[in-house]
């Protein structure tokens, strides 16, 4: 009985949907987190009767067919790269991007990866790093005697040395854009990796046309909407229950047939 296998695909799909929703809710306070959404597509179809062919008496063309679907499959889990709200932290090393763009980060193995989380700090040598100690690209080293640091909206890094009246420029941040941000691969630790689907990074200066502005003393919060997640959670739960009832009904029908054959 095909209803059993069809409903089973529905239960599997809703289980994955539930896992995606659970991960969104778990990361509701994760800086720069981008909400994920499960995408589904229908499976193959089985033709019981084709449309557009002669009828049994060969006197007319059948206008509609009988084609039965065989269930559902997961086609993608898409990260929605929508701007999150900004939170004022008062920390000079906290940076938010307003608009399209990604901070570039170098991992210990030399790979350049990308993040929207601008929770930065300096390491023992004054290099600008992430909270996990990964270096920001291009590299910026803050002098030990700097008494003030300023990140402009265009990514210039300025410091005040001692009691100097003027700021000195010590670096320039650049950010990366991608033609297909949905093609980036999430790695964990708020990092994403480029893939053939995302295309190569387009590197530019903040505040240039098509590139985000940098906002100092702010962080971009998660773009998860709690109300929507709870609504989606209830919808997924109901869909799972309905598929479960179909399996139960199909099992009862099969039991009835088996009983009548005895």
UniProtKB/Swiss-Prot annotation:
Main location as per UniProt: other
Superkingdom, natural source: Bacteria
Subcellular compartments: Bacterial flagellum basal body
Keyword Cell cycle assigned: no
Claim: Secreted is one of the keywords in the record: no
Entry GO CC: bacterial-type flagellum basal body, distal rod
GO biological process terms on file: bacterial-type flagellum-dependent swarming motility
Entry-linked SUPFAM superfamilies: Flagellar hook protein flgE
Keywords linked to the UniProt accession: Bacterial flagellum
UniProt xrefs under InterPro entries: Flag_bb_rod_N, Flagellar_basal_body_rod_CS, Flagellar_FlgE/F/G, Flg_bb/hook_C_dom, FlgE/F/G-like, FlgG_G_neg, LlgE_F_G-like_D1
Family statement drawn from the similarity comment of this UniProt entry: Belongs to the flagella basal body rod proteins family.
Known partners and oligomeric status: The basal body constitutes a major portion of the flagellar organelle and consists of four rings (L,P,S, and M) mounted on a central rod. The rod consists of about 26 subunits of FlgG in the distal portion, and FlgB, FlgC and FlgF are thought to build up the proximal portion of the rod with about 6 subunits each.
Full protein name: Flagellar basal-body rod protein FlgG
Source organism: Rhizobium meliloti (strain 1021) (Ensifer meliloti)
